[in-house]
UniProtKB/Swiss-Prot annotation:
It is an enzyme of class 4 (lyase). The gene is ipdC. InterPro entries: DHS-like_NAD/FAD-binding_dom, IPDC, PDC/IPDC-like, THDP-binding, Thiamin_PyroP_enz_cen_dom, Thiamin_PyroP_enz_TPP-bd_dom, TPP_enzyme_TPP-bd, TPP_PYR_PDC_IPDC-like. GO terms for molecular function: indolepyruvate decarboxylase activity; magnesium ion binding; pyruvate decarboxylase activity; thiamine pyrophosphate binding. Transmembrane segments: none annotated. This is Indole-3-pyruvate decarboxylase. The keyword Metal-binding applies. Binds 1 metal ion per subunit. Binds 1 thiamine pyrophosphate per subunit. GO terms for cellular component: cytosol. Pathway: Plant hormone metabolism; auxin biosynthesis. Its cofactor is a metal cation; thiamine diphosphate. The lineage of its organism: Bacteria, Pseudomonadati, Pseudomonadota, Alphaproteobacteria, Rhodospirillales. It comes from Azospirillum brasilense. Its EC number is 4.1.1.74. Keywords: Decarboxylase, Lyase, Magnesium, Metal-binding, Thiamine pyrophosphate. Mg(2+) binds at D429, N456.
Length: 545
């Protein structure tokens, strides 16, 4: 079996559903094998950042491996930012890079695409991946592939594989199973017992769920765990959309001073806060009204569980959830606490200008009228804060890393592995300038996302923190006018009535991407972003309790 074929089969066997990429001369042999064997569908895009974002989204959507293939140097370095974001947000993207042949560096000449040395790229990716391998030895390649892919699955973070172009067709053995990761069964049982004891002894326990629950495909089991625990459930900012289909869905999303006051009180006054799969990031917790004392929480994350001042190591989240379920009898109790979050509805379809919350109401009205909720791919900015108030079938966004440019390629990547389900993308004009042009690939890829573009001709979120800076002003690019040339339909809307009509048409039209360019006056923010900004200013102006 050829090395490239063995790698592709190993990826498919481990759940990968597609490969996103852009070829280059050092990667041409690998792409040839990928195209001819069709082991994984190959989806090419226009710029490497989008390749990384699309692979990230495919991994998030399917709770499995995403695959991004690029050429050496000029291609791989272009994808560093997207992979760094995937690392930060625990998305298992497999980066495959072509490379110079094993003897090409021996001629005494510098090779095109190389950085400082031929090894520079490998060293750069060591900083943003959890396992790496250069597949330059056919005898060792299968074991190296298994080791690296096993790390991606166990740790839910990106990994890096580099294939010299003269090794692509080398004969190798099939790739075996992933190496076993250590789990101390006695420690796992003791940990589960201690977690349950802490939750039972608390007077105000709360379960807070975050991204690892989805990354490891545990939503159904965690929904059952929440039911058996019978405690209030909330999500983090990054976990928004988790357990949406659970019998008793979460009460809402914790955003500290920017969010629902009752949820904020519930979380911050809890004496038994169970942070399940939660990233302890500033976007999740820096806007707390009162500083949460992590010494009084239970934190399960990154194959470890911390209670107070001690930590259980080598505790996989899936194993912990199973052990907790074994220690709890089945229950049909409903979760205690307030009513679930009430989404804004009732758009007034009139001649008034569009505000971000009008977009949320327009989307929610369609769902209330019987439209099946769509998964939302959101970019960074007020579009993400507005999405927090939309009814959805899941939300993916760079909520922690907070990079721009994720939204459009993420929507493309998600729909490519969705089995035909449509994706709703929300994006600002600043981020659209970066990666929105990837929509030109939708016709060739056979997908038709709906894209709502928040156009205020501004880096508006940056303006909220530094309003005096003129560099926040952007020009009006008239994005909707360009949609037809890229194979889609575009419409610019300025009023709430036009917004409703455009959204109705977009949902009714299949086979072409739909771009709704919603013109929003500068300075008009979603309710959630406005509270977030006010809360940040208040917190920075006065010491915390």
């Amino acid at each position: 079996m050829k090395l490239a074929e063995a790698l592709l089969r190993a990826l498919k066997d481990r759940g990968a559903q597609a490969m996103f990429g852009i070829p280059g001369d050092f990667a041409l042999p690998f792409f040839k094998v990928a195209e001819e064997t069709q082991i994984l569908p190959l989806h090419t895009l226009s710029h490497e950042p989008a390749v990384g974002f699309a692979a990230d989204a495919a991994a998030r959507y399917s709770s499995t491996l995403g695959v991004a293939a690029v050429t050496y140097g000029a291609g791989a370095f272009n994808m560093v930012n997207a992979v760094a974001g995937a690392y930060a947000e625990k998305s298992p993207v497999v980066v495959i890079s072509g490379a110079p042949g094993t003897t090409e560096g021996n001629a005494g000449l510098l090779l095109h695409h190389q950085g400082r040395t031929l090894d520079t790229q490998f060293q750069v990716f060591k900083e943003i991946t959890v396992a790496q391998a250069r597949l330059d030895d056919p005898a060792k390649a299968p074991a190296e592939i298994a080791r690296v892919l096993g790390a991606a699955r166990a740790l839910s973070r990106p990994v890096y594989l580099e294939i010299p172009r003269n090794m692509v067709n080398a004969e190798v053995e099939p790739v075996g199973d992933d190496p076993a990761w250590p789990v101390d069964r006695d420690a796992l049982a003791a940990c589960a017992d201690e977690v349950l004891a802490a939750m039972r002894s608390a007077t105000s326990p709360v379960l807070m769920v975050c991204v690892e629950v989805r990354r490891y495909g545990l939503e159904a089991k965690v929904a059952e765990l929440a039911q058996r625990l019978g405690v209030p459930v909330v999500t983090t900012f990054m976990g928004r959309g988790l357990l949406a289909d659970a019998p008793t869905p979460p009460l809402g999303t914790y955003i500290g001073v920017a969010g629902d006051a009752e949820i904020t009180r519930l979380v911050e006054e809890s004496d038994g806060l169970f942070l399940l799969g939660a990233i302890l990031s500033d976007t999740n917790f820096a806007v707390s009204q009162r500083k949460i004392d992590l010494r009084k929480t239970i934190h399960a994350f990154d194959r470890a569980v911390t209670l107070g001042y001690h930590t259980y190591a080598d505790i996989p989240l899936a194993g912990l959830v199973d052990a907790l379920l074994e220690g709890l009898p089945p229950s049909d109790r409903t979760t205690r606490g307030k009513e679930p979050h009430a989404y804004p509805t009732g758009l007034q379809a009139d001649g008034e200008p569009i505000a971000p919350m009008d977009i949320a109401r327009a989307v929610n009205d369609r769902v209330r009228a019987g439209q099946e909720p769509l998964l939302i791919a959101a970019d960074m900015g007020d579009c993400l804060f507005t999405a927090m108030d939309m009814i959805d079938a899941g939300l993916m966004a760079p909520g922690y890393y907070a990079g721009m440019g994720f939204g459009v390629p993420a929507g493309i990547g998600a729909q490519c592995v969705s089995g035909g389900k449509r994706i709703l993308t929300v994006v600002g004009d600043g981020a659209f300038q970066m990666t929105g042009w990837e929509l030109g690939n939708c016709r060739r890829l056979g997908i038709d996302p709906i894209v709502i573009l928040f156009n205020n001709a501004s880096w508006e979120m940056l303006r909220t923190f530094q309003p005096e800076s003129a560099f926040n002003d952007l020009d009006d690019w008239r994005f909707a006018d360009m949609a037809a040339g890229m194979g889609g339909d575009g419409v610019r809307v300025r009023t709430r009535a036009e917004l409703k009509a455009a959204l109705d048409k977009a949902f009714a039209t299949r086979g072409r991407f739909q771009l709704i360019e919603a013109m929003i006056p500068r300075g008009v923010l979603s309710d959630t972003l406005a509270r977030f900004v006010q809360g940040q200013k208040r917190l920075h102006a006065a010491p915390r309790e």
